[in-house]
Amino acid sequence: MKITFLGTGGGRFSAISQRRMTGGFRIDNLNGKNYHVDPGPGALVRTYQFGFDPRNLDGVFVSHAHTDHYNDAEILIEAMTRGMTNKSVLDGYERWGPGISKYHQSHSKKYVLEPNQVENINGCSVKGTKTVHGDPEGVGFQIDYRGFKISYTSDTGYFEDLHKYHEGADILIASVLRPGNKSIRGHLCSRNFIELLKEVKPKLAIMTHFGLKMLSIDPIDEAKRITKETGVKTLAAFDGMSFEVNTQNPARIRIKTL
């Protein structure tokens, strides 16, 4: 199993400026299947840039109906046969979405997840996780393959029970928009992430989806500080970062730059 980050920028200003790419990330060879998670602006181009073929996708995960998460979903759906998402991306909710046209929906198998709802997909259990964000129908995801769990918070503010949705995660991937205590509604800052890691205690934590304030410092230094404070190995993802998942010892990885 391999995880590759096709973009690590987050929020509208990072997406517009492209100081970091916004292509989301891929999970490849998960029980022999390949998935793209939150394909924001440029995801298709970055797919080819980093040596992948979108026609080999088996699924697309879209957490919510904000452009930096769903922008390239339609063109990826053109290239594959299944889509996985949340309700507002497909149906819309008040002023959010829909992000996927009826035409593209008709050409893929759809799974709509809500918090704690579980779907069995290609030999994996996929659970929706609660988020507190601008899109009230948004979700994160926890993928369970033979007891090995990868959790993704997507965009969410910190709330008291957040850790319960990501309980048991071996790898926790989180959208951490801002450094230090610089919290903003609907997003995690480093302080929030530290609290979450102390509660979930994953074997490996990865920060991504960086806003301009995070990028104005060095996210790598921020990750080192978080590692020291929590005892959880924490990485700051970068564009083109790729690694094979070590299911026996997730914290022991060899990172490649594509």
What are these regions (language model features)?
Residues 1-50, 137-154, 171:
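Conserved beta-strand hairpin/beta-sheet module of binuclear metal-dependent hydrolase folds
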Residues 41-91, 170-172:
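Active-site metal-binding motif and surrounding structural segment of the metallo-beta-lactamase
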Residues 52-55, 122-124, 167, 200:
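Structured loop/turn residues at beta-strand edges in well-structured enzyme cores
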Residues 82-93, 200-205, 232:
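A short helix->loop->beta-strand "cap" motif at the edges of active sites that frequently abuts
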Residues 85-139, 145-146, 246, 253-255:
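Metallo-beta-lactamase
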Residues 159-242:
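Cap/insert and terminal regions of metallo-dependent hydrolase folds
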Residues 233-258:
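Binuclear metal-dependent phosphoesterase catalytic core
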